[in-house]
Amino acid sequence: MNTKKYLFATLAFIIVGFVIAFVWHLVIFKSVYDSLKIYSIEPIIALGFISFILEGLAFVYIFQFFRRGRKPLQEGLIFGLVVYGVIMGGVGVLAEGAKHATTSLSTWLIVESAFYIITGAVLGIMVGLIYGKSPGK
């Protein structure tokens, strides 16, 4: 494992992912989420940040086993969409929607699914580009 790339990609994941989540949930779509009444009145920002630390450590670690080092952008995009968009999104959207009361389940499903897909694509591409092509590929 290339420790420098791992740490850099993880740090980038944490910072970029947290910024996307913060802006998405607490700025751009704040009124939508407020109207859904699915979140606590005061979000606990520290828990969100800790979540991104854990996600980043795992996402980047597992990415190293997935990548082939030939097409970093494409490999990162696919990995991000599958791991973040589908797997994490499945839990974050479907399971949360099933467990919590909301004023509009369809709005929740659309907005939160879009968040996971877009975030997964951005983070996957970014990590793929940080790792880049493998030598000789």
Task: Report residues per predicted region.
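Juxtamembrane/disordered regions of integral membrane proteins
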Residues: M1-K137
